[in-house]
Amino acid sequence: MSNSHKKLMDILSCPTCHLAFSIKNKTCKHCERSYPEYDGIFAPINDLKIQEELKTLFIKEKTLKEKIKDFIPMPDERLWSQSSKKTINKILLEKNPQASDCYVVNMGSGVETFYKKVFRKYDSLIRIGIPHEGSVDVFADAMQLPLKSNSVDLFFSSSVIEHLPDPERAVSELFRTIKPGGLVYAEIPFIGAYHMAPNDYQRYTINGIESLFNRHGFDMVKKGICSGPINALLLLVQHAVVEAIPIGPIQYIFRLILTWLLHPFKYLDYIFNRFKWGEYLACNFYYLGRKPL
């Protein structure tokens, strides 16, 4: 059993009644709800639609496009700001996932090369969610988390909230599961093309993100540009060109080439992110909030 899985066992709960839950029998002894397992990974999820998505995830054959993607992985399409990098490194020092009494949960983040490098040395970091890439310790619905109340020291959520039909409920769940004094670090797009994974519902301004988390009790520690206006512009151009190509494998190859060709220009955001107007045209924002003691 991995270190992250051991830590998960300490804070796992039934998503229905939120009481302690054993993964061995897959049935909650309190409310008697039973949950399935997919590809050896436990899935305490009540939403039947999500359950069906998980089933198809493991039975469908890979397309040619997906096989090419496995052979030639896509580099990160956006560039993280200096401010967001410093913030992430700082909170990982404050809430070290390797500490025995510290529980750090990653929901969604980790697919990108940037996050793989950041999280590489933390084998006790718990990953949950419905990944379109990579692995998790447990499948989970962000709007009904299978975690004990007041159990998490630090929650990461990168580019997840825009894919949820009920973001208010998801942020409410983050507040429930985080310990008093604990932190949430979230990244949410502002200007970006529609992208399904499997659905895409909303975008937020920098003030909209703060308002969303404030409504559910969080105190803002910091907010800012995660990926700037040049990233937004180049990604829109890239998507406009790529989406005009109907054939999947060729589309992926064009996207790969454009990502590499345009990437150097994204460093211009290290300059433009310093200006106030950068917030008006940014690609992504980040938000750091703390649950009051």
For each feature predicted by the language model, list its residue ranges:
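Helix-to-beta-strand junctions that scaffold the AdoMet/dcAdoMet cofactor pocket
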Residues: 164-165, 178-180
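S-adenosyl-L-methionine-dependent methyltransferase catalytic module, highlighting the catalytic core
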Residues: 167-169, 173, 183-293
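A short SAM/SAH-binding and catalytic strip from SAM-dependent methyltransferases
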Residues: 153-165
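Conserved N-terminal segment of class I S-adenosyl-L-methionine
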Residues: 2-148, 154-157, 280-285, 292
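GHKL-family ATP-binding catalytic core of two-component histidine kinases
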Residues: 146-148, 165, 205
